Amino acid sequence: MNTCRVWAPNAREVELDLGESRTVMTRAARGWWSADAPLGDFDYAFRIDGGQPLPDPRSMWQAEGVFGKSRQVDHSRFQWTDQTWQAPPLASCVIYELHVGTFTPRGTFDGVIENLDYLRDLGISFVELMPVNEFAGSRGWGYDGVALYAPHHAYGGPAGLKRLVNACHERGLGVILDVVYNHTGPEGCFLPQFGPYFTERYRTPWGPAVNFDDRGSDEVRQFVIQNALMWLRDYHIDGLRLDGVHAIFDQSAVHILEELAGAVRRLEAELGRHLFLIAESDLNDPRLVRPPEAGGYGLDAMWSDDFHHALHTVLTGERDGYYEDFGRLADLAKAYTDGFVYDGRYSAYRGRRHGRP
C-alpha cells in the first residue's frame, strides 16, 4: 500500500476520496493527516469536514486542471538519458527565456523540443522556462499558478516536462525554471482551505503574503522548500529563478531564502551535479548573493534591473515611472561594472535612497 498525507491543522476530519470509496484519515502531530492508498498512479481528492472534494496542495498532476482531482505520479518510471550531464557555470552563459504556451503554435513541452536545435544553434547555454505549474485555464503567463507541484496539463504534464529537460540536456542545453513563492493566483487556489498558507501580517500587490513567519509557518516553509527540491531532483532542472523575492516577507532568525539555499546545497552534494538559485529583486541588496558566513542568503545570482532600465532608457529615451532614475550612459556603465546603479544613492522616483553597496 501507499500512504497519502496532507497538512490540514484546523480540520476536525479529513477524508481521502478515491471516487468509488472514501477513507477517514488519521490525524498525527502538527496537523498532518494520513491514510493508506493504492500503489501506482491513481486519482484522488481530500474532503475537509465533509466538504467538497479538493485537490492535494502537493498534487503532482492535475490532469483535468486545477478544479479536477489530483493524480499520483511515480517519478521513477521515466527513463532519463542525461546521467552524465553537468550544467555549465552561470558566469559564462547565455540564457534564453521562453513561454511554453506561446513559443510554438502547439504551445506544449513537445513543441519546444521540436525547436531545440534552433535554440542550440543560436549559441545559447540555458533555456529558461517561465512558470509551468498549474494555473486556472489553459492560457496564462504562469505567474498566477495555484498547484505549485503540478506541471500544467495543457503543456504536457509531468512526462512532457521531463521529456523537454532530457532533450535539452542531450543537446548540451541547461534548463532554468521560473518559480513563484511570493503569491498564488486568485482562481483555483484551495490552499487557505487546508491551512495558514498565507498571512495578513504583510500585503503584496497580489493580496496576502505567503506565510513564512507567522503561526503554522514551519510547514509552509517546508512546502516551498520541498517544491524547489522536487523540480531539481525529480525533473532534473538545473536552476530556479525565484520571482520577486522583494515580496517574500520573513522576519525569522533564518530567512526562508537562506534556508532554501542551504537545502539546495545539500541536494547538490547528494546528486553530484551543480544546481543554482537566481533571485529577481528590486531591492538592490547584494546580501542575496553573499554566502551565509558573510551575512548573506547564499543565492548564486540575481537579476540586475538597473542594467535593464539603464539600457532601455538610453535606447528609447523613456523616462516615465521608475525609468525617471535612468537615462545617462554613465548609468549604463555603472550597472555593467558594479551591478547596481543605485547602491545607496538617492532615487528621485522613490524619493529616498535606494540600494546597498
Task: Show where each model-derived region lies.
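Solvent-exposed beta-hairpin/edge-strand motifs
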Residues: 21
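Conserved alpha/beta catalytic core and glycan-binding cleft of carbohydrate-active enzymes
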Residues: 257, 261-357
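The feature marks proteins involved in alpha-glucan
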Residues: 1-3, 24-97, 102-107, 118
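Core domains of carbohydrate- and sulfate-ester-processing enzymes
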Residues: 48-83, 171, 189-205, 318, ...
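Substrate-binding/active-site clefts of carbohydrate-active enzymes
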Residues: 83-90, 99-239, 244-270, 288
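Short proline/glycine-enriched turn/loop motifs at strand-loop junctions of beta-rich domains
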Residues: 7-14, 39-41
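Short glycine/serine/threonine-enriched helix-capping/active-site loop
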Residues: 96, 177, 279-280
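Conserved aromatic beta-strand anchor motif in extracellular beta-sandwich/beta-rich domains
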Residues: 16-18
